[in-house]
């Protein structure tokens, strides 16, 4: 059951991480800055 629990956590974290990256890139784009990491 631990594997299923960890799998659920990962599936929940992936969309949050992608959303965070998208928002960060969008804010940088709006400020006119290049996407240099």
Curated annotation (Swiss-Prot):
The keyword Calcium does not apply. It holds the Pfam family PetG. Keywords: Electron transport, Membrane, Photosynthesis, Plastid, Thylakoid, Transmembrane, Transmembrane helix, Transport. It comes from the Eukaryota. InterPro entries: Cyt_6/f_cplx_su5, Cyt_6/f_cplx_su5_sf. Its main location: plastid. The keyword Membrane applies. It is found in: Plastid thylakoid membrane. It is a single-pass membrane protein. GO terms for biological process: cytochrome complex assembly; photosynthesis. One of its GO terms (molecular function) is electron transporter, transferring electrons within cytochrome b6/f complex of photosystem II activity. Disulfide bonds: none annotated. One of its GO terms (cellular component) is cytochrome b6f complex. The chain crosses the membrane at residues 5-25. The 4 large subunits of the cytochrome b6-f complex are cytochrome b6, subunit IV (17 kDa polypeptide, PetD), cytochrome f and the Rieske protein, while the 4 small subunits are PetG, PetL, PetM and PetN. The complex functions as a dimer. Belongs to the PetG family. Component of the cytochrome b6-f complex, which mediates electron transfer between photosystem II (PSII) and photosystem I (PSI), cyclic electron flow around PSI, and state transitions. PetG is required for either the stability or assembly of the cytochrome b6-f complex. This is Cytochrome b6-f complex subunit 5. The lineage of its organism: Eukaryota, Viridiplantae, Streptophyta, Embryophyta, Tracheophyta.
